[in-house]
Amino acid sequence: MAFQRRRNNYYNRLRRLLPFICAVSGALLILFALLSILSPPPDDSDRRISKHINYGANDEKKNTPVVFTVPRGGGRSDRDIWRSWNAEFFYGCCNASSKFPNAKAITRNDRYLAIATSGGLNQQRTGIVDAVVAARILNATLVIPKLDQKSYWKDASDFSNIFDVDWFMSFLSKDVKIIEKLPQKGGQTWSPRRMRVPRKCNEKCYINRVLPVLQKRHAVQLNKFDYRLSNKLRDDLQKLRCRVNYHALKFTDPILEMGNELVRRMRKRSKHFIALHLRFEPDMLAFSGCYYGGGEKEKKELGTIRRRWKTLHVNNPEKQRRQGRCPLTPEEVGLMLRALGYGSDVHIYVASGEVYGGEKSLAPLKALFPHFYSKDTIATKMELKPFSSYSSRMAALDFLVCDESDVFVTNNNGNMARILAGRRRYFGHKPTIRPNAKKLYKLFMSKENTTWEEFASRVRTFQKGFMGEPKEVRAGKGEFHENPAACICEDTDAKVKAGKMDSRKFGKKEQKEDEDAELSSSETDYEEDQTDLQDRGLYNGTRLDYDDALSVSEEPELEEMLSD
């Protein structure tokens, strides 16, 4: 009986507390609901366009709630923003030495090498350059390379539609014998033995793998020929690479004339101009696995594109960005340039495909640099008609304008960026800016909590070693097409006369630096960045190696789409 009374008392107390518990719970639910409504979503703001930034506002607008005010002018700079430091003391040098025999003396009449290139215009260019060297290694006659007409780009152009064939053959006549097509055998066109060599195949590799087949079959075609030659070759072969890339490969007259006209129109608008290879296309962003704060719409759009590539695993977007693997947004590129000293009066030529987000993404960049052009805005549709149906010819026009620009800015390290970087080093070290994305990441994320002066100072510090200046990268480091150190000489006599001789001792003009010299911090940053790209298999703009047959069959478009 006593037990029953105690149990009744317990339930009575519980019933009296129940309304109070319900009231407290209800109040908490209402509080949480209010907080969820009033609080912004965590880290889901659109990074393509920053809030609370005033682009070039006057100091009078003191009531505007702006934390980060970007000046209209570039400010005072401690450097000439239109030329590289000490560039006048370096020059391209790729003449053959007296020990490099003439092609007639070493070419075997029963050896023919053909190649089939791969990818977009600039990836194919690397294949053409290396094919000449491969033919020289094998003492073979080179057949004019076949351009890729079946990949993602679906460009029906052949070699003669892009490059001047006669000039190519005549300029290299002392180095390699070149013919337009294989000779006939028994009244029929010679059918070559098709094969493929590994990536980065060196001289010994070609002798061991290709030469025995060539000696037996006399005609060999190397397929998917891109980056199939080692970065490290003896100097006379490296100089041959440079003769091909910087002198023998000349665009056809129609391309040159239109490209030069585009440059003339840019020069008519301004004495100096910047060319920007933006690379903010949907395909590029989808492949990178990066996220720019566009919410579910962005995730769905880029996710749909990304699913085309079955071999890509799911990335951590924040980790990708921290490690410098994400292209800068158009706004971030603009802020970097302003911090480096380029004011709103600077004219910019943009080489880009479809920009993700369209005008919304481009708006901050255009606000920073209103003098904003592309080939479509400075040329008529009628003028571009002979080129517009061919992706390689359109890319060639952009290539020419970017090459002739006073400053070239690249937002990724694809083939076009690397080839132009090497070419601009060879022809006078014209400024070539590549964002140090790994270091800039945190700075961009916290920019609205700092002053412009502090932001600009840190950008300038982080970009040391990424500006295309002489000796920025140690000889032999990185991709040869980007850093053709064997083909760049130093005029030490002129440097001594100018009173700018380095404290280190220099020997002859072509003497290499001591390999054990201590790296500067900026060079270390650069080399870490290149090593990271190589480790991820992205050094030539892709995760896939064509040596993997399974990858080829599953991902036929991946490399071509992202290569340039």
UniProtKB/Swiss-Prot annotation:
Protein name per its UniProtKB record: O-fucosyltransferase 6
Pfam family of the protein (one): O-FucT
Keywords associated with the record: Carbohydrate metabolism, Fucose metabolism, Glycoprotein, Glycosyltransferase, Membrane, Signal-anchor, Transferase, Transmembrane, Transmembrane helix
Chain intervals for the UniProt region annotation (Disordered): 501-542
CDD domains, sorted: O-FucT_plant
Spans traversing the lipid bilayer: 17-37
Pathway it works in: Glycan metabolism
EC number from the UniProt entry: 2.4.1.-
Gene Ontology molecular function, alphabetical: glycosyltransferase activity
GO CC annotation terms, alphabetical: membrane
Organism: Arabidopsis thaliana
Compositionally biased intervals (Acidic residues): 513-532
